[in-house]
Amino acid sequence: MIIKNGNVFQEDGSYKVADLYVENGRIVASADELTDKTELDASGLKVLPGLVDIHSHGAVRHDFSDADVDGLRTILQYEKSQGITSYCPTSMTLPKEELLKIFQTAKDVEQDETCARIVGINMEGPFLDPVKKGAHVEGYIRKPDIEFFRACNEAAGGMIKLVTLAPNMEGSEEFIRELHNEVVISIGHTAADLSLIHISEPTRRSYISY
C-alpha cells in the first residue's frame, strides 16, 4: 500500500508531506519493495504511529470491570477510532470471583481490524494500601498474594502484564521476588517512603502508577 501526500510524523516531532510505503504491516523504503501498490490519499491528514494506552478502565459508558465481552469490544473499537492501536484494559479492586470473570473476558473478546489490539492486562488492585485506596473499595483490598495473582493470570490466559503493588503491605517483598520476572511490578496506591520504593536486585520495580 502507498499512503500518499500525508503529513508524515518525523523523528524530530515535526510533520512533512510525503508518501509512505507499507508492506505486510511494515514501513519499507520504496515502492520497489511493494507487492500491493494500492494508493490511499491522505492529503490534509496526519500520518503517525498508533498510540499505546496501558492504563484505561473503559470508555463510552463501558468499563472493563463490567466483565462484559460485548462492552469490552465496544471499548476496543472506540479506542481504535481515536488512534489507539495497542491497549491494556485495566481492572479495579474487586472480589476474586469477579476478577476471574473480568480477566476471562479479555481472553475471550473477539478482536478484528476495527479494534485496538489487547497487548496485555493492567491489574490495578487488590494489592493496595488502604490509606491510599483512592476510588478502590477498601473492603476488597488484600495483602499481596502470589497464588491469587497466578489464578487471575491463568483466567486471563497469561495476559496480565502489569500489576500494581503497595510495597509497604505485608507480603510485598515475597510477591516481588517471586514474580518480578513474570510481570511488570508497578508501585502505586501506597504510603511507602523511598526506603521501600528503592530499586534493588533482585526485586526490581520498573513502573509507577498514580
Ranges and model annotations:
Residues 6, 25, 44, 55, ...:
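Divalent metal-coordination and catalytic microenvironments
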Residues 45-67:
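Di-metal (Zn2+ and/or Mg2+/Mn2+) metal-binding site signature of metallo-dependent hydrolases
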Residues 76, 100-107, 149, 176:
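Generic structural signal for well-ordered alpha-helices
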Residues 142-200:
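Histidine/acidic residue-rich metal-binding segments in metalloenzymes
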Residues 197-210:
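Single conserved hydrophobic/aromatic residue that forms the stacking wall/gate
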